[in-house]
Amino acid sequence: MEKSYSESYAAAGVDITAGYRSVELMKQYVARTMNEHCIGGLGGFGGLFELDCTGYKHPVLISGTDGVGTKLKVAMIMDKHDTIGIDCVAMCVNDVICAGAKPLVFLDYIACGRNVPEKIANIVKGVAEGCVQADCALVGGETAEHPGMMPEDEYDLAGFTVGVVDKEKILSNETMAAGDVILALPSTGVHSNGFSLVRKVFNIDADPDVLFSTPAELGGKTLGEALLAPTKIYVKPVLKVLEEVQVKGISHITGGGFYENIPRSLKKDCCARINKADVRTPALFHLMQKVGGISEHDMFNTFNMGVGMVLTVPAEQADKALEILHANGEPEAYRLGVIAEGEGVELC
């Protein structure tokens, strides 16, 4: 059967053939994420995945959805679209592992003013790379043209993931107590939160060329390159730790920084006590604080400050947890603080 084509629809701004071309170009990337649990191919009405319950007494599915926010604006100005998909996957899978779950499948949604097949395929290339890093399958997606609603050269990107965890292994902070140790897993940079403030600080909307500047603090990188560093995906090292260590809490440090996200994994009447001098903050954050005149409190209440994820473990297992992290892709993981009596986050 010939591919359908509607001259009337194309005249209204939706090119069906561009959609077909996008799918053909992205197939090679999607194929990298497929595994023995995937049933059927690309193009069906739904993504099929055969759940293997071997090893699970009572499997529980956990889902998460997120987007990349206005980091997309930086990608559009830089005309670099092949890593922003990693951010999309990271924002979703890093959330579900906070419950101790292994991500299984991922789906993406792209809305655009005009479907440029090469650009769409590049975006999906990044999504597929993120799925490979997270060891989950890209089983479906949607690309929607929105003529008249979005400028032709703009797009939005969001994703959705489903993971699985044994019910008895869902992370609980019930045994969290004073003396437990908080471990930091470093970020690659700003990740995917706080970009509305980043854009304001550097006046990016009015002066997009600033993204091509090379501030001395960034060691030869352009500002745009530093800001587009993909969000780190912590799935594999964290799952390794969960196999051998009693993890009492995990927080993905996203919008709201330390003050909003660390308390989400704390037991009532427990406080995260962190010495600010122990936080290994990259130069990019110091540059933003200086240029924007941002208070230290607002920095820690907006950005990850170089810490993308924190794990709370018993003091006697902290060294073992670090050893596992160091051997599984997190060589720079370190002790960040301790649990004390109280509530919230205490930065001293």
Placement of each model-derived feature along the sequence:
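Residue-level signature of catalytic and energy-coupling elements of molecular machines
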Residues: 15, 66, 179, 252, ...
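Short loop/turn motifs at secondary-structure junctions
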Residues: 100-102, 197, 246, 332
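Hydrophobic face of alpha-helices
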Residues: 23, 121-124, 195
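N-terminal amphipathic/basic leader segments beginning at the initiator methionine
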Residues: 2-37
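Glycine-rich phosphate/pyrophosphate-binding loop regions near the starts of catalytic domains
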Residues: 28-188
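Short, acidic (Asp/Glu-rich) active-site segment that either coordinates a divalent metal cofactor
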Residues: 156, 169-222
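Buried hydrophobic packing segments
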Residues: 22, 26, 48, 92-93, ...
